[in-house]
């Protein structure tokens, strides 16, 4: 059974995309409270550069949906250059806000992570992106994860926390 992040007492946690997304979109008061703990230095947070790719894409789609309604992916496919031009400044500002967050360490994805990714996909039947997150977690020695993705529960060494 997963615990909620407000009960997290460890020294470090790895952030999946959902937690920064919830903070930047303002959709979960619990995300703001958790990031306040990080900002105060009560714990260290890690995430991967890969998270920023996922986050930028989700933020872009959310802004398109907010502004135009409908199916944002269909709209983006139909008018990609205009929509990216329109919303990229707002997305970039949000990413910059996150990158400057104190006590948040952004780890690179390295070539050595690919071997861990491949093995994790085989061993735990998880998606490639999530297997790369797992590789980054192993490399920094942080196996506590903030994520709503239940498939991470297939990795016995991880402890998953939710909002």
Regions found by a protein language model. Give the residues of each.
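Anionic, Ser/Thr-rich low-complexity intrinsically disordered regions
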Residues: 43, 86-101, 108-109, 148, ...
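Active-site neighborhoods of divalent-metal-dependent phosphate/nucleic-acid chemistry enzymes
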Residues: 2-8, 92, 96-144
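Short, well-structured N-terminal submotif of metal-dependent ribonuclease cores
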Residues: 1-54, 58-74, 140
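Alpha-helix capping/helix-boundary segments
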Residues: 19, 51, 113, 133, ...
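Short, flexible helix/strand-to-coil boundary loops that buttress conserved ligand/catalytic motifs
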Residues: 24-25, 59, 121, 156-159
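Phosphate- and divalent-cation-binding pockets in alpha/beta enzyme and binding domains
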Residues: 54-55, 116, 154
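Helix-adjacent hinge/juxtasegments
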Residues: 61-93
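Histidine- and aromatic-rich ligand-binding microenvironments
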Residues: 14-16, 47, 126-128, 149, ...
């Amino acid at each position: 059974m997963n615990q909620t992040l407000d009960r997290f007492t460890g020294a470090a946690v790895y952030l999946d995309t959902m937690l920064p997304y919830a903070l930047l979109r303002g959709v979960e008061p619990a995300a703001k409270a958790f990031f306040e703990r990080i900002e105060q230095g009560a714990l260290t947070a890690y995430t991967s550069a890969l998270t920023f790719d996922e986050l930028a894409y989700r933020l872009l789609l959310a802004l398109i949906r907010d502004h135009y309604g409908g199916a944002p992916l269909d709209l983006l496919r139909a008018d990609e250059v205009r929509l990216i031009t329109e919303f990229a400044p707002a997305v970039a500002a949000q990413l910059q806000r996150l990158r400057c967050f104190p006590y948040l360490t952004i780890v690179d994805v390295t070539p050595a992570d690919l071997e861990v990714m491949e093995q994790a996909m085989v061993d735990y039947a998880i998606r490639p992106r999530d297997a790369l997150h797992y590789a980054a977690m192993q490399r920094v020695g942080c196996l506590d994860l903030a994520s709503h993705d239940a498939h991470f529960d297939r990795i016995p060494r991880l402890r998953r926390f939710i909002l």
